[in-house]
Amino acid sequence: MISAAIVGGTGYTGIELIRLLSAHPEVSIDLLTSRSEAGTRADEIFPSLRGISDIVFSDLGDETLATLQQCDVVFFATPHGVAMQQAEALTEAGVKVIDLAADFRLQSLTDFEHWYQQSHACPELLKTAVYGLPEINRDKIANALVVGNPGCYPTTAILGLKPIIEAQNKQSKQLIESRIVIDAKSGVSGAGRQASLALNYAESTDNFKAYSVEGHRHLPEIEQGVAQLLDSQFSHRVRFLPHLVPMIRGMLSSIHMELTDAGALMDWQQVFEQSYASEQFIDVMPKGLYPDTRSVRASNRLRIAVHQDNERAELTVIVVQDNLVKGAAGQAVQNMNVMFGFDESLGLNFAPIVP
């Protein structure tokens, strides 16, 4: 049994972490922090936790920081910039850190400072941090002290592109043209739990809109995934268009590419099936079937469909996930399982909720 702490337990990802870790047979949640709710039981704020967790929120003071250093793993479900203030002291004490914000996702300090408008507090630790996408970085995660949990959109994008880039790296010719278009839609929970006019019921219901078209913070993370994580041997230009749709949770990304003559000769359905044959959380749909967001709701599953149109020389990959689970808290637990040598599906092997 390992001791876990959750810093920032009142946001949607924090709530999901409590839900998932409370059911994990090898984890004890020994500390839960919130400045705004210190002294309050978690199940008083979130009735869904009644009978599951009666832990009391603590403030993040000096005494709490000392307690964090006695844990085996600390999850940061906090705004960007919080984890990097504490990570160095925690790792020096032998504590493993999983950050669900962006502090340890981007390896480039210049990119981090540009997109998040703040200086990095521990650039040396950033150099050793591991990007927490188990389907690609499993071996590195197993030996990591600090894991940067991926963003929700990049999870769909990078896993949707992985079989293509890997197949292309084995060839002497490009299989897809340079331009990649990612048209992504997220439920409103992806924007967080804070009060916002855009998330007001009257504003978000019966409404559908694009946002951050000029540039979203997840774009450099996707570009890093293609160029470095997947180590593409060819250059690609990614156009990323995020949208907010009137549903609570769920994400669907459509990835559009043009095939070269060599790419049109490939059987991309087979490529995807072979690439993910051993991945228990990734389901490649049979040819002609397309996933919907409800099929992965409240689960750590990610479903992929592949559509190849050789007449138009086009390849479309459709990816769905629950943005709060595989796109956030579930993936964090999956990373924890890898870091501590547990079965990767432990605490995560449950069916999606239907309807």
Swiss-Prot record:
Pathway info: Amino-acid biosynthesis; L-arginine biosynthesis; N(2)-acetyl-L-ornithine from L-glutamate: step 3/4
Keyword Phosphoprotein applies: no
Subcellular location field: Cytoplasm
GO molecular function, one term: NADP+ binding
Source organism (scientific name): Psychrobacter arcticus (strain DSM 17307 / VKM B-2377 / 273-4)
InterPro entries reported in the protein's UniProt record: AGPR_AS, AGPR_type-1, NAD(P)-bd_dom_sf, NAGSA_dehydrogenase, Semialdehyde_DH_NAD-bd
Coiled coil ranges: none
Listed HAMAP family: ArgC_type1
One GO term of the biological process aspect: L-arginine biosynthetic process
Protein name: N-acetyl-gamma-glutamyl-phosphate reductase
Taxonomic classification: Bacteria, Pseudomonadati, Pseudomonadota, Gammaproteobacteria, Moraxellales
DNA-binding found in the keyword field: no
Function in brief: Catalyzes the NADPH-dependent reduction of N-acetyl-5-glutamyl phosphate to yield N-acetyl-L-glutamate 5-semialdehyde.
